[in-house]
Amino acid sequence: PDVDAHRLGARPGEVLPRILAQTGSGTARLALVVSKFDSLHQLPRVSDSRAAILANPAAHFNQDATMRRTALAPDLAAAQFEADSRFLDAEVRALFDRINEESVTLVADQAARDGRIAAVRHFAVSAVGESPLHANQLTQRGISPFRVLDPILWGLSAKGVEL
């Protein structure tokens, strides 16, 4: 079906400057989150060369180590989370570059350089974990959130909260 243009709202590159205009202290951390990432996991099934980047099973945006880290000592879990989230940030940035949608990243990076925000990091999350089979039917696994805690954990870790 056609997309209803009235429901789209403003483009991300227009929204972020409005949000940044309301930050003044330079202490805020900005998490740029791609939600509904389960939908993007379906793209490698189509024959489009731009989707190939999503087919790599070793990519951090195709893995979620949140539960595995709970068995680690807090300092090791924090170090692994930091390394993982930095790698994920690089992958999401590359994905935006691949689809020629760097405007939000450029605006956010400039705000960090100017001191309007303390840091910026990219995340990919999915509340459901997998695309439903039909409009009213979940997959066999049901709801299995994917990386939804990452932005929150990043914020907490900056405040010294043990992960």
Whereabouts are the PLM-identified features?
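Conserved C-terminal guanine-recognition region of P-loop GTPase G domains, centered on the G4
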Residues: P1-R116
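Non-catalytic alpha-helical scaffolds
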Residues: A5-H6, A28, S39-S49, D109-L163
